[in-house]
């Protein structure tokens, strides 16, 4: 096989990766859709609840996510999850829907990522016994690279969440320390006032 033919074939065999990455604020319910063109593709899904709109409240209850197939069938569901990952093989081509539900009274910021992996393998164009294994190795390598990228994005979202949690905890610790300090000062003033009143009362009784 010529070099030109090899390059053309590589272009045909190279996998197509469709990715949806979004960070959004949810009130009650939000739905997104993603189209799968081929059966047998792999859909990777992940989400992380990054933060709440109230610095005094950080939601530990999580959100719900329900995945529906092209005909409305339920593929998978997550209940009250702060973060999760899931992947499945596309059984039917078409539009897949991802619906989030927030049961918290606060708005939540969610990092959502969908990756669709597809490898167009044309066996009729690759009869060479040395060329076919090469294409299989390329396919596995690219899939591994995209999986690493997917995992990295999920870990970055987890890191963002933890940073916000730590920041909120630090603010709460500072506010708590200030409150306790003011409470201690107030208690000291009250104690001085009561002792002074008691002393004045005893002094008045001794004069009588």
UniProtKB/Swiss-Prot annotation:
Domain GOLD: 29-116
N-terminal signal peptide: 1-21
Keyword list, A-Z: Coiled coil, ER-Golgi transport, Glycoprotein, Golgi apparatus, Membrane, Protein transport, Signal, Transmembrane, Transmembrane helix, Transport
Pfam assignment, any one: EMP24_GP25L
Transmembrane segments: 177-195
Alphabetical list of SUPFAM superfamilies matching this protein: Supernatant protein factor (SPF), C-terminal domain
GO BP terms, alphabetized: protein transport; vesicle-mediated transport
Coiled coil: 134-149
Motif (COPII vesicle coat-binding): 198-199
Residues in the Lumenal compartment per record: 22-176
Residue spans, topological domain Cytoplasmic: 196-208
Keyword Transmembrane among record annotations: yes
Glycan-carrying positions: 168
Extent of motif COPI vesicle coat-binding: 198-208
Taxonomy, superkingdom: Eukaryota
One GO location term (cellular component): Golgi apparatus
Topology class, membrane: Single-pass type I membrane protein
Locations listed in the record: Golgi apparatus, cis-Golgi network membrane; Golgi apparatus, Golgi stack membrane
Motif interval(s): Required for the export from the endoplasmic reticulum to the Golgi: 207-208
InterPro entries recorded: Emp24-like, GOLD_dom, GOLD_dom_sf
Record's subunit section: Probably oligomerizes with other members of the EMP24/GP25L family. Associates with the COPI vesicle coat (coatomer). Associates with the COPII vesicle coat (coatomer). Interacts with p24delta5.
Family the UniProt entry places it in: Belongs to the EMP24/GP25L family.
Entry comment, domain topic: The cytoplasmic C-terminal domain contains an Arg-Val motif, which is involved in the anterograde ER-to-Golgi transport of the protein.
Role summary: Involved in vesicular protein trafficking. Mainly functions in the early secretory pathway but also in post-Golgi membranes. Thought to act as cargo receptor at the lumenal side for incorporation of secretory cargo molecules into transport vesicles and to be involved in vesicle coat formation at the cytoplasmic side. Interacts with p24delta5 at endoplasmic reticulum export sites for endoplasmic reticulum exit and coupled transport to the Golgi apparatus.
Name of the protein described by the UniProt record: Transmembrane emp24 domain-containing protein p24beta2
Organism: Arabidopsis thaliana
